[in-house]
Amino acid sequence: MLQNEVENFTNLLEQATVYLAPYQEKIIVVKYGGNAMINEDLKKLVMQDILLLNQLGVKVVLVHGGGPEISQGVKLLGKEPQFINGLRVTDQDTINVVLQMLAGKVNKSLVALLKGKGVGLCGIDANMLQCEKLQAEVDYGFVGEIVKVNTQLLELALSANLIPVISTVGVDDQGVAYNINADTVASEIAMALGAAKLVSMTDIAGLLRDRFDESTLIPEVEVSEVQGLIDQGIIAGGMIPKIACCTDFINAGGIEANIIDGRVPHAILVSLFGGKNGTLFYKK
């Protein structure tokens, strides 16, 4: 490495250390999904960024979805994926696909990209995600809601400087497996671990005043403003439960939560290093 390259690298490292100081030896939970997971180039960049954070002393927990792969697996069975109010209807065939694709193929492909630092976990392991069947007006099948998060495996992995990579399947007290919403899992795990920050990667720029115009991005929201934004119709549809996960985390003692644009290369680093990406939720 040439002298000027060494100097540039040193300067960058010093700047990164300043921005990361509040998070060193602290836990950040990242919910990973959307286009950043489908696009192979973006996927590699995300894993590289998470590895870098790990090397710089940040304890990262990665919670991932896998919707497209699950839908593809269901179609291979000759069935059409079904959704109601944004939630996947999960019959017996579908939960089998979830276990094979989400907890299997998708999880292990991410672990492989973490080059020996990732450890693949499923919410069924050691009853990490204890859940019960989701009670709703509609019967979603094997869709669960979390009753308790057991953090023992996560704490063991983090203490060994490993990166837990978690697929969002839980189990009830009868040993029945359930599919669980990834944003909910990330928020519940962040609260259970006392994480400093929750990051949710999406396929949109963040919270928009006009959902058809990305120039109307709202960069910051104080949690007390959320209900007013719902009343105005600015927070609507699938953003309501996503933002509820952020506010639940902050109200439980988390420092801040970000909904970031996963289509942007190095989106996680940009948000941590003080750049403009997505919407930051915080409490005064």
Curated annotation (Swiss-Prot):
NCBIfam families: argB. Substrate binds at G66, G67, R88, N179. Belongs to the acetylglutamate kinase family. ArgB subfamily. The gene is argB. This is Acetylglutamate kinase. GO terms for molecular function: acetylglutamate kinase activity; ATP binding. PANTHER family: N-ACETYLGLUTAMATE SYNTHASE, N-ACETYLGLUTAMATE SYNTHASE, MITOCHONDRIAL. It catalyses: N-acetyl-L-glutamate + ATP = N-acetyl-L-glutamyl 5-phosphate + ADP. Catalyzes the ATP-dependent phosphorylation of N-acetyl-L-glutamate. GO terms for biological process: arginine biosynthetic process via ornithine; L-arginine biosynthetic process. It comes from Actinobacillus pleuropneumoniae serotype 3 (strain JL03).
